[in-house]
């Protein structure tokens, strides 16, 4: 259908509706005519003159309000033109913001009676081609107004005041472990608009005085409801219902309030035009007051979020879960709201300076709340608060009455100086005396103790030093024979006496006689050296040989006991010399076997000679001087010659 023909048909319909309203209206024909003119079929916004006329008529009596609700409801239910439906919804929106509060109540009462005036879920435009996007906007706009009435009804029943919650930063004394004290979700400062239509300064979206800004604004929030007296007049308008501050509400009521606000925000976000509706002037004009209301809606949501955050750490587990869900859903809605505002700024809906600074809910805050919910689930119940016991009242003691007969000491004179305390007398230092080397007076030693000390001296371990004296260090020398200062012909006690005179304070207070382990070891070593000297002269056989040379003789041999084992150590001998107790390698054993075979044969010859001539007296000893010549490299077996080097010995002669 051509636009001109459509406009003509629309004008005819409007004139017909006006004529029917003038003739058939029984209650308020002027009101119905004004409603028809305000919701005409032309594409221009409604004139401010008709809007002001409707506002004035509805403010006269409750009957006009009821007639207005009936007329607008009938207009919305019969029309199939999105322009007429959109103008009717804009009129309802204007009456909700600036009209009498009874108009809102009448809409709610009509809803209870079954007349769902704002239920336009089945609306479809049939007058325009390609008007699907416009019809979708009309349906969502009606849903937004309907949800706003639901929120108003909830606040009327519960008596909620969103902005009466006080400052959200009173939690300075609470635990800040999970980020308490955040002021990210406080309400912005109060603005000059409060869910009303139009802007300040008397200019509308078009910029002239014929739009929505010419009527003085009446600041009204959702909770600014009035109680009606029950009569048909407005006698009860001045009686306001007592509101409850948001912070004093129970968690159930706070969650109910938050649910209504979030559902209303969802309806607002769904108002974003799509398709051809983005370029429609009528839709942008209808969107302007809704965007202005969303600023206050966002502030109310931030206020509720701040209250939930303050009470979050003191709630029960079920309430914590609900609060966390509210934060999670609000985070997604705020992201969509930022995108919607950006589109509105680009399109030119309202000025950029009017938009509030929207703050996102950070993922860190959500993670913190989720962690707290998990911890609360593990505990099973909320922690019990410990009541702080009030300190007992201080009982003021009554001052005793002075006794006139009591004897009191006189106060000291003003110039009185107390005498200084006496200085402590210095204690004389005890002189340190050097004890004698042989001191038998300090500790009496019994025969048993002396015997025990002699027994302990035979062990290899050092004796325990419990006295003042300490044994002088031997520097690893365990024997007097290993001391290089010990020369042949110098007694051991002289060396010990020289060393003790220089280190007298380090000596150990021992029993009389000065028993020393080093001297004891030297005595045992002297016996070992003598044994070595005696055995070194008898090197004519192996360890098992009994053919030994006779002392003082060079050719005579006699039988003797076997040589000592390998435990006897030589003094100043090479530490890497072969040991007799450990078998040598195989290549060494071969040479040893040859030597032993030679000695065995020699020993057998000696036994044979002894059997033949040994029993006949001294005459047979002369025959023993002659013997076989030893092989080259074999040691002499007659015991003659100089003694081996490295031994300390005493000449017995």
From Swiss-Prot:
Chain positions with Phosphoserine modification: 221
Annotated transmembrane regions: none
Phosphothreonine PTM sites in chain numbering: 244
Pfam families found in the cross-reference section: ANTH
Biased amino acid composition, Low complexity: 160-171
Protein name, UniProt field: Putative clathrin assembly protein At2g25430
Basic and acidic residues biased stretches: 172-186, 376-389
Keywords: Coated pit, Cytoplasmic vesicle, Endocytosis, Golgi apparatus, Membrane, Phosphoprotein
Molecular-function GO terms, alphabetical: 1-phosphatidylinositol binding; clathrin binding
UniProt keyword annotation of Transferase present: no
Compositional bias ranges of the Gly residues kind: 197-214
Acidic residues composition-biased segments: 395-404
SMART domains on file: ENTH
Keyword Membrane set for record: yes
Domain ENTH: start-end pairs: 23-159
Chain spans, region Disordered: 160-240, 376-431
GO cellular component: clathrin-coated pit; clathrin-coated vesicle; Golgi apparatus; vacuole
Record CDD domains: ANTH_N_AP180_plant
Biased composition (Pro residues): 410-425
Domain of life: Eukaryota
Gene Ontology biological process terms in this record: clathrin coat assembly; clathrin-dependent endocytosis
Organism: Arabidopsis thaliana
InterPro entries recorded: ANTH_dom, ANTH_dom_sf, ANTH_N_plant, AP180-like, ENTH, ENTH_VHS
Localization in the cell: Membrane, Clathrin-coated pit; Golgi apparatus; Cytoplasmic vesicle, Clathrin-coated vesicle
